[in-house]
């Protein structure tokens, strides 16, 4: 036989005992504030107190001191009330962050989870309310629906964070302001429609007509609400605009007329191509009051981007011009390219010459240092074009002899002294420079085919093979630059290695090639 109310009666009895100080065997000190409680209740609700009482001796369990810089006294009082009541009553004077810090210190994971959910919901609500404040235009009398109530205050009961669903903020689309006769008084916009019991009929909302002297510009975009901006906002930057009455939504004109700025000397002249002038249309005079039949809002259209046939042609030519920044494969390695492969584009005479920078790298920049071609392998005329090409494309890794002037503390080049661009060391030949480059790149291109160990220099691999795999291998008298760069090191025809291989002796194969691994 079960008694469902037994747990509630037990908690109520414990609350009464704590309030009277009856059988309270523990005092919790949070700063200078004391809290009387029962050890069994504290240890049952918090793993922190459970470990504390297990580790302490019997005569040292009466007083528990908690760091008051982490756990505040009001937050601990709320958690202590939760232990005895099973309900967390969040008050306005205690920040939710303090409750979260206290629950984390006491290892009360359920309270931590609830506090995090509430903080996330509050952050989302504040972000949505800020977005709505930015999008809402106070001058156009935009009213939210009755279901949009914004963030709710913190309550005693715990609610899941899923309450902030998209249906909470879903409302009808913002209606366009409707003009009303002059004798009808406008509805005041000071009423608060966010309360649940107040609803406003949208058919009775009327926006006051704008004054004749102050014409406003309405800028509409698909991702934001309509904002009303005075005409003098564009007085400094944009040219004058033409004014025409707003066309009803159910009336579709036969041909859409593009309204463009009348002044062509504005700041947008260099960005947009000129468009053919549309046929002039009679614009209403601002000094005259509109007729009763045409008692509608006057909307000023600002067309910043004019769509024309010329702009469509320019958009089709744009991919071809972007390809012209880099030369084709035949232009770099083939010396003189053909006229069709050169940088020739119609109407591209307005390109400016780009100075030397790191944005345009040679095609060989992805190769390692030991595979880069030497000074003699570069062509002087990389690109032959009637248009100026970027200067960085003409600069090889090893400049020709005319670049004898000093170029800073590193990379000083002379005619016969190759210099490392990284550390500034000079070498006798370009092969030594490429061999030295592996010190900076940390590359190990030479790999042993027997044990797959990698080495930076070919000589190290040769000595490893001679010592580890074949002790009788002939010593190298002098490194061969041509054999060790790309083709690899091959044993001489009259060496001991070739004779041993031809005789068919036992042991591992003696024919090998030293070179960079693929």
Curated annotation (Swiss-Prot):
It comes from the Eukaryota. The gene is Zbtb3. InterPro entries: BTB/POZ_dom, SKP1/BTB/POZ_sf, Znf_C2H2_sf, Znf_C2H2_type. The modification Phosphoserine is found at residues 308, 495. It comes from Mus musculus. The keyword Nuclease does not apply. There is a cross-link at residues 131-132, 478 (Glycyl lysine isopeptide (Lys-Gly) (interchain with G-Cter in SUMO2)). May be involved in transcriptional regulation. Its main location: nucleus. Residues 126-207, 310-338, 349-368, 472-518 are annotated as: Disordered. It is found in: Nucleus. Residues 24-92 form the BTB domain. One of its GO terms (cellular component) is nucleus. Residues 472-481 have a biased composition (Basic and acidic residues). The lineage of its organism: Eukaryota, Metazoa, Chordata, Craniata, Vertebrata. This is Zinc finger and BTB domain-containing protein 3. Keywords: DNA-binding, Isopeptide bond, Metal-binding, Nucleus, Phosphoprotein, Repeat, Transcription, Transcription regulation, Ubl conjugation, Zinc, Zinc-finger. SMART domains: BTB, ZnF_C2H2. A zinc finger (C2H2-type) spans 418-440, 446-469. GO terms for molecular function: DNA binding; zinc ion binding.
